[in-house]
Every structure is written in structure tokens, then in C-alpha cells.
Design a protein with these regions (language model features):
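Juxtamembrane intracellular "pre-TM" segments in multi-pass secondary transporters
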Residues: 2-8, 193-226, 419
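Extracytoplasmic gate region of multi-pass secondary transporters
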Residues: 32-34, 220-274, 361-362
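Helix-to-loop junctions at the C-terminal end of transmembrane segments
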Residues: 64-76, 273-286, 369-370
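Cytoplasmic helix-loop-helix junction between adjacent transmembrane helices
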Residues: 101, 107-146
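Helix-loop-helix hairpin linking two adjacent transmembrane segments in secondary transporters
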Residues: 141-194
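C-terminal transmembrane helical hairpin of 12-TM major facilitator-type secondary transporters
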Residues: 287-333
Length: 419
């Protein structure tokens, strides 16, 4: 095996380890939704409290995600991957073993503190080992395998029915065990990366400072994209990760296992479709039209789910396409709208606002459900939540359409000069 072949093998091994670590991260994040009904039945949690368990994940990242990027640049991807994976594991354990809501919320907060910086670190890890045409594919592959963690969390009521039959805690203990495998993968990556520490040093030397005045240089197209980012992610993650399984059970009469399976297909479709959509957009060199299509599918799917008698499979399929298409296009398009030396600032700002939006959407949706008395006995109580999600996703789709019409025509994308 020559040096080049050996280097490629190590790169793909790192990719596999990072993907395995991301799998655990996604699983733990989505572990609350499947036990939401059990938490209400056995521990008396309200919808507001259940929503807060996911909302609190995002709250620290309104600020800390900027700090996390600086720490990754300073200490390197490998060290930050393993250290933040350890924080995530501690958060998952605290969530599973806490005797009350306050302890569980503290565990989810701790998990959130580690998880987003963990994601930045794994992104930097892929960047260290891949370049050129393979970079996007490696990132897409890592994200896709990570999303299998969300699929697995949704399928866990079926796969681990015995654990769910024993109450709310065993499923969360399984999530903590999965977080342990994530930490183990991160630790192995850190050990393999030891000879390549100079890569981290080079990245630290080239790191750019976050300067607030750089925001003044972004064009209107970027702000349309940022608005779509916060609205679209807030709706799809708050609904899918927190409330969808209960909604399917109480409004559409599904049992827990079937509701979890229905919800899981959104992520299962994205596992295969996201890299494919990314390849297609690169192939035809068009981004804004695909982004507008993906954004528009979300309010359409929510309307079908709420207002029509069509099968839930239709709505979940449309959500799956939206969840595959929008992320595949959003991040490459961002690189076309801002200059390379401002790309980190642009992404950092988008993630900050996105986390604030996700936290807010979870809390608002939970409050609306509690206010309306949403339950299996009162399925109409979920209407206010669905109107909220539908309105936000429609505004997001409008931003995507405006972006397409003002800066996303074929000739404009071909001649794009980052602002």
C-alpha cells in the first residue's frame, strides 16, 4: 500500500468514526419524542415541560456556538470532538438517572452545551482529511449516517418494545448507552489523529476572528437565506423531534410504535436523498430553485396533515423530501452568497439564530398545546400548534421564493460574486 492509498484509507476510517459519533449524537437528541407520552403518563409532565426538554438543548447555543467554533480552531478538531462527546455522554446519563424534571432539564442542557460544538468539531475533522470533490460527498455521507441515529430513535419503541414496556427510564438508558458508543468513536478518532496534529495547528494559524461589522457586508440574498434557515429548521425540528409522535397518536389514532415508525421515515429518506440531491445540484449548477421547492413542500405537507383526509404517508413523504432537499442546498448556496473570508461568520450567525428559533418554537408549541388542552381526548387542541407551524413554514417558503426571484436565476447563479 503506497502512501497515497494509506492516506485515503485513514481518511475514510476517520469519516466512518466521525459518522458513528454523529449517529449517537442524533439518537440522543431525538430520544425525548418517543418517551413524551410516557413522561406525561408516569411523571405528570406537561406539554410545556416536554417541549422544554428539547428547547433547553438549543438555549445555550444561542451564544456558545460562536465560542465553540473558536475552541475548535484553538484546540483542534480531534481534541474537541472527544471532549464534547464526553460532555454529551454526561448529559445523557444525567437525563436518564434524574428523579425529577429539574434534573432531566439539567441533563438536556448539559447535552446541548456539548452537542453543537461537537458538530462543529466533526465538520472540521472531515475538512482536515478531505479536499476537492470528495469533501462534499464525505460531509453528506457523515450527515446521512448521523441521521440514521434519528431514525433509530424513532424506531426504538418497536425495536426495544420490552424496554418501553417497563416505563420512561429504560429507553433513556439505551440513549445513554448510545452516547457511550459516540464517545468511544470520538476517542478512537482522537487516538488515530495523533500524527496529524499539525493539521489542527495549520487551521488555528489561518483562523479568522468573528467581527460584528462583517455583518454589514452581507447582501440581501443572505438575509433571505438566514430567515429561511431559522423558520424552516424551527418548524421541522420542533414538530418532528418533540411533538409529532404525540400528534400522530392523539389526532390520527396511531399506536406508539406505528407513530414512531411513521416519524422515522422522514430521516430514513434523508439518509439516501440528501447526498443525491447535493450531487444533482452540483451537477446542474442550480441551487435556489431546489431550495425554494424544498421549503415550499413543508407548509404543503403540514396542510395535508391537518386539513385533508389523505394518508399520513403522503404528508410524511413530502416532509422527507423537504428535509432532504433544503439542507443539501442551503450550505453550498451560503458559500456562493458570501466571500470565503466571511463564510465562518455567516454560518456562525445562521446557527446562532437557528438555535434561538428552535428553542422558541418548542416552547411556543408546548404552551399552545397546554393552553388548548391538547390530548387524546381533545385532539382539536393541537390545531393552534399546527397553525403556528404552518404560518412559520409559509413565511420561510416565501423567503426562499424571494431569494430565487431576486438572486437565484440561472444567469445570476452562473455569474455569482459572493458579497
Amino acid at each position: 500500500m503506497n502512501k497515497k492509498t494509506s492516506g485515503q484509507a485513514i481518511a475514510w476510517l476517520i469519516c466512518a468514526l466521525v459518522a458513528a459519533a454523529q449517529y449517537g449524537n442524533f439518537y440522543v437528541y431525538d430520544s425525548i419524542g418517543p418517551v413524551a407520552d410516557l413522561l406525561q403518563q408516569q411523571r405528570g409532565f406537561s406539554d410545556t415541560q416536554v417541549g422544554l426538554l428539547n428547547a433547553i438543548y438549543s438555549l445555550p447555543n444561542v451564544v456558545l456556538i460562536l465560542v465553540g467554533g473558536v475552541l475548535v480552531d484553538r484546540f483542534g478538531a480531534a481534541k474537541m470532538t472527544v471532549s464534547t462527546a464526553a460532555v454529551c455522554l454526561a448529559g445523557a446519563l444525567l437525563t436518564a438517572f434524574s428523579p425529577d424534571f429539574t434534573g432531566m432539564a439539567a441533563g438536556r442542557l448539559l447535552f446541548g452545551i456539548g452537542a453543537e460544538t461537537f458538530s462543529i468539531a466533526t465538520l472540521a475533522a472531515i475538512t482536515d482529511y478531505f479536499s476537492g470533490g470528495k469533501l462534499a460527498f464525505a460531509m453528506g455521507l457523515t450527515l446521512s449516517i448521523g441521521r440514521l441515529g434519528s431514525y433509530s430513535a424513532d424506531m426504538s419503541p418497536d425495536w426495544f418494545s420490552h424496554a418501553y414496556g417497563q416505563g420512561w427510564q429504560p429507553p433513556l438508558l439505551i440513549a445513554a448507552a448510545v452516547a457511550g458508543t459516540s464517545f468511544a468513536a470520538g476517542l478512537l478518532y482522537w487516538w488515530i489523529d495523533r500524527p496529524a496534529r499539525r493539521s489542527a495547528a495549520a487551521r488555528r494559524a489561518n483562523a479568522e476572528r468573528f467581527v460584528l461589522r462583517d455583518l454589514l457586508h452581507f447582501g440581501r440574498a443572505y438575509w433571505y437565506l438566514l430567515a429561511l434557515c431559522v423558520l424552516w429548521y424551527s418548524v421541522i425540528l420542533a414538530f418532528r423531534s418533540t411533538f409529532s409522535i404525540k400528534y400522530f397518536q392523539h389526532v390520527h389514532g396511531l399506536d406508539l410504535a406505528t407513530a414512531g415508525a411513521m416519524n422515522s421515515y422522514v430521516f430514513l429518506a434523508a439518509v439516501f436523498a440528501t447526498p443525491a440531491f447535493g450531487w444533482l445540484c452540483d451537477r446542474v449548477r442550480r441551487y435556489a430553485p431546489f431550495l425554494a421547492l424544498g421549503a415550499l413542500l413543508l407548509p404543503v405537507a403540514l396542510a395535508i396533515m391537518t386539513l385533508s383526509s389523505l394518508s399520513l404517508w403522503v404528508a410524511t413523504a413530502l416532509i422527507g423530501v423537504s428535509y432532504s432537499l433544503v439542507p443539501a442546498v442551503m450550505w453550498p448556496l451560503t458559500s456562493k452568497l458570501v466571500k470565503p473570508n466571511r463564510f465562518g461568520t455567516a454560518i456562525g450567525l445562521m446557527w446562532v439564530v437557528q438555535n434561538a428559533g428552535i428553542a422558541g418554537a418548542n416552547m411556543v408549541a408546548g404552551w399552545l398545546n397546554d393552553r388548548a388542552g391538547a390530548s387524546a381526548q381533545n385532539p382539536a387542541g393541537y390545531d393552534a400548534m399546527m397553525v403556528f407551524f404552518g404560518t412559520a413554514s409559509t413565511i420561510g417558503a416565501a423567503c426562499a421564493l424571494i431569494l430565487w426571484l431576486t438572486a437565484g436565476r440561472r444567469q445570476q447563479e452562473a455569474a455569482a460574486q459572493p458579497a
